[in-house]
């Protein structure tokens, strides 16, 4: 089965061979080939992917604390039948009902005082489950395709992502694999999502345009894409997307964006409302996170209680730290690449676009809070800390990811008009 990308149509090798060998139906070699099937998997990853190497005990944090590490079925079976000297501890420190490692003080039961893994030390690397072996490598699965990224929740991965100066590119290769079938996988929608994401990545990486307009284009495109799907008019989206591409970032587009803002809603008030809408609904994975979030936002909003002082701080921050615009771009690209095409499973296209913008703006607000304290450019380590801590609270919890998406999809505060206000500067 050969995957023809972009259209996502599947053809068997017998159909291809039938075309190639037309007129040679009596050829025994040809008849043999026609009975064979070849399946290929397409694997995509960002250009910085291979730069990652675990820094072990030099890491400022551990990847084995603050979240419940789920165990895949194959590893669980391996642990159940393990006969070595490590067997008793292995069996005692696994929650067999939940298929997860037990935690003590929010730390994995196998994490020792040196922040190293006792399972790795005592039983070897072959005993690690899929999650522990792959992390921070994150995999999104689609039929005939895997998309790999480095999770922002890892300090070293966050450092790599933030340090990219050039626009990120994505590399793809194929490998022969076993056949797989996903029930009810919508290839037409997936093809439209892939094509649209390609276009939106180009939009987000257009450095001739201020980031705020790039975010606005992302939002209006995903909004219109969602409308087409809701109306069951997916066939019309290609034409609509072409109009978005043609309009670019013209003065007419910028004027239209300004006209979609709510005139009675200041950015600072809107951001406060968004924090209040989301934070109470999310589970807290690290006790330190609540303290950090409260202290940082108090620094920001007490220093700048009104729109005028807030905007002055934001403009001062942008002047002092111009390279943030590139890092902001890298974050937008990270969120969009990782989650957008997952809309093939739930059709929440606009919510995925909102997620890229809101998560990036959340991180920006926290960085701005740090800036409000010192009025000097944040250190690279401070930026990394904000990014990976935010990511851990969100991406290490399926419950939090699902809750955020539901809020983005349903709450009025996340309407297009409100979000255009956030793109006004």
Feature-to-residue mapping (PLM):
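Low-complexity, intrinsically disordered or signal/transmembrane-proximal segments
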Residues: 5-8, 29-32, 39
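Immediate flanking context of iron-sulfur cluster ligation sites
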Residues: 41-59, 91-129, 146
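Polybasic, low-complexity association/targeting segments
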Residues: 48-96
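Internal, well-ordered alpha/beta segment that forms a basic, Gly-enriched binding/recognition surface
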Residues: 115, 123-224
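Hydrophobic, aromatic-lined core segments that form the binding pocket/scaffold
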Residues: 209-425
